[in-house]
């Protein structure tokens, strides 16, 4: 779902599913900015333009679902 996101007022559950070790520095910084610290860690963020842009940077490291 991370590739088809558009900015809106929807709440997103973002879960880190892969490690940032060996990744580029900007990808590690993006995960930290999203509030993700370890594999399996989940945060809830609004799908604003900033968050969608960050998710488009690391789609291979996170799983995105609509929050319930």
UniProtKB/Swiss-Prot annotation:
What CDD domains does this protein's entry cite? Ribosomal_L30
Q: What is this protein called?
A: Large ribosomal subunit protein uL30
Please give the InterPro entries that the UniProt record associates with this protein: Ribo_uL30_ferredoxin-like_sf (IPR036919), Ribosomal_uL30_bac-type (IPR005996), Ribosomal_uL30_CS (IPR018038), Ribosomal_uL30_ferredoxin-like (IPR016082)
Per the record, the domain of life is Bacteria
PANTHER family xref list: LARGE RIBOSOMAL SUBUNIT PROTEIN UL30M, MITOCHONDRIAL RIBOSOMAL PROTEIN L30
UniProt KW Ribosomal protein keyword: yes
Q: Which organism is it from?
A: Arthrobacter sp. (strain FB24)
GO CC, alphabetical = cytosolic large ribosomal subunit
Q: One GO BP annotation here?
A: translation
Q: Which molecular function GO terms apply here?
A: structural constituent of ribosome
Name the keywords, alphabetized: Ribonucleoprotein, Ribosomal protein
User: In which family does this protein belong, per the annotation?
Assistant: Belongs to the universal ribosomal protein uL30 family.
Q: Which PROSITE patterns match?
A: RIBOSOMAL_L30
Kindly list the organism's lineage. Answer: Bacteria, Bacillati, Actinomycetota, Actinomycetes, Micrococcales
This protein's assembly is summarised as: Part of the 50S ribosomal subunit.
């Amino acid at each position: 779902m991370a590739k088809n996101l558009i900015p809106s007022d929807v709440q997103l559950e973002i879960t880190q599913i892969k490690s940032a070790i060996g990744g580029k520095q900007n990808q590690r910084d993006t995960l930290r900015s999203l509030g993700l610290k370890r594999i399996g860690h989940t945060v809830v963020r609004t799908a604003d333009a900033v968050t969608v842009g960050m998710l488009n940077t690391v789609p291979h490291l996170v799983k995105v679902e609509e929050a319930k």
